[in-house]
């Protein structure tokens, strides 16, 4: 039997291909199930889940930018109980689709409460920890900007989680390396990166920010070079697997993420412009890999990681 050249294995996840719709751009999957069979996907990262329901930020919440968009949704979600009882069971009809649950919170206790329970769902195979949230107990500074806080949070959720933890790194920091190292020391199983870059747009007529929240997260093709740089930086100091994301919209973008050091790839904003983008990427990968002399993604991951080790 021929080996699947697109297959990759990372902690908790045996993926038939590396393409994963990113959290916040794919709802809870059901919205896209009208377009294609979700079982085609490597995995899906569902919308952020918090202990209680959140209504999110006031509108306007999104603004277009050249080569991207700003969003300030504010983690709108139905809360842990509804996700466990309604959203996740609906995805059980896809037997070959491992789910990555995205977890957010306002304090360490929030994260611990959700991580302790959500991994018990039979189809949740890993957790993505969104540490870009403001820590309300520490003056609103994001968890992911302080190595010590990031270490403590990772350690706390690892104690209660029954599935591997992938910590989502924020690019809104001076130096990402000490934060990644602190998270690895806290026991993380991998990273997902990058989260959105902080941005703002101003309405020339009102002279005020377009977003009601004033600032929002910048995503889309504009941030891809930043993502590539940061993935490369983290991969050069850590052997933990990385789910790379940030501006992916073509097959070449996917392979560039792998060559920077990723072991799987998240696709976010591109889902809004083309609902079929993920199946298209999956279909297009084998031909492009053949053109570039790439036998398999597992082999590419090995070669890139070995090359980075030798460069140290």
From Swiss-Prot:
Binding site for FMN: 23, 47-48, 102, 130, 168, 194, 220, 246-247, 268-269
One Pfam match: DHO_dh
Main location, first listed in the record: cytoplasm
EC numbers on record: 1.3.1.14
Entry's Gene Ontology BP terms: 'de novo' pyrimidine nucleobase biosynthetic process; 'de novo' UMP biosynthetic process
SUPFAM superfamilies (UniProt xref): FMN-linked oxidoreductases
Residues bound to substrate: 47, 71-75, 130, 195-196
Pathway where this protein functions: Pyrimidine metabolism; UMP biosynthesis via de novo pathway; orotate from (S)-dihydroorotate (NAD(+) route): step 1/1
Protein keywords: Cytoplasm, Flavoprotein, FMN, NAD, Oxidoreductase, Pyrimidine biosynthesis
Cofactor: FMN
Cellular location(s): Cytoplasm
Active-site residues from the entry: 133
Catalytic activity, reaction form: (S)-dihydroorotate + NAD(+) = orotate + NADH + H(+)
Single GO MF descriptor: dihydroorotate dehydrogenase (NAD+) activity
Chain's role: Catalyzes the conversion of dihydroorotate to orotate with NAD(+) as electron acceptor.
Family to which this protein belongs: Belongs to the dihydroorotate dehydrogenase family. Type 1 subfamily.
Subunit structure: Heterotetramer of 2 PyrK and 2 PyrD type B subunits.
Protein name (database record): Dihydroorotate dehydrogenase B (NAD(+)), catalytic subunit
Species: Enterococcus faecalis (strain ATCC 700802 / V583)
Gene behind the chain: pyrDB
């Amino acid at each position: 039997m021929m080996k699947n050249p697109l297959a990759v294995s990372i902690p908790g996840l045996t993926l038939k291909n590396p393409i994963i719709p990113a959290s916040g751009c794919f709802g809870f999957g059901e919205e896209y199930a009208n377009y294609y069979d979700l079982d085609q996907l490597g995995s899906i990262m569902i919308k952020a889940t918090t202990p209680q329901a959140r209504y999110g930020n006031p509108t306007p919440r999104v603004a277009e930018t050249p080569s991207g968009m700003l969003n300030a949704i504010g983690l709108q979600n139905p809360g842990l109980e509804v996700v466990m009882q309604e959203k996740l069971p609906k995805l059980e009809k896809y037997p070959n689709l491992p789910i990555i649950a995205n977890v957010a919170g306002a304090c360490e206790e929030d994260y611990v409460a959700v991580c302790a329970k959500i991994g018990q769902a039979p189809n949740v195979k890993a957790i993505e920890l969104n540490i870009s949230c403001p820590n309300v107990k520490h003056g609103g500074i994001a968890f992911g900007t302080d190595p010590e806080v990031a270490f403590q949070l990772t350690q706390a959720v690892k104690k209660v989680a029954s599935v591997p933890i992938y910590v989502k790194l924020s690019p809104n920091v001076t130096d990402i390396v000490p934060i990644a190292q602190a998270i690895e020391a806290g026991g993380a199983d991998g990273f997902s990166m990058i989260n959105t870059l902080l941005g703002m747009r101003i309405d020339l007529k009102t002279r005020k920010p377009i977003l009601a929240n004033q600032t929002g997260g910048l995503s889309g093709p504009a941030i891809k070079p930043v993502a590539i740089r940061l993935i490369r930086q983290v991969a050069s100091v850590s052997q933990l697997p990385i789910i790379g994301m940030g501006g992916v919209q073509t097959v070449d973008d996917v392979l560039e993420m792998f060559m920077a050091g990723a072991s799987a790839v998240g696709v976010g904003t591109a889902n809004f412009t083309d609902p079929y983008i993920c199946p298209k990427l999956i279909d297009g990968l084998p031909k492009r890999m053949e053109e570039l002399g790439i036998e398999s993604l597992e082999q590419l991951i090995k070669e890139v990681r070995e090359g980075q080790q030798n460069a140290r």
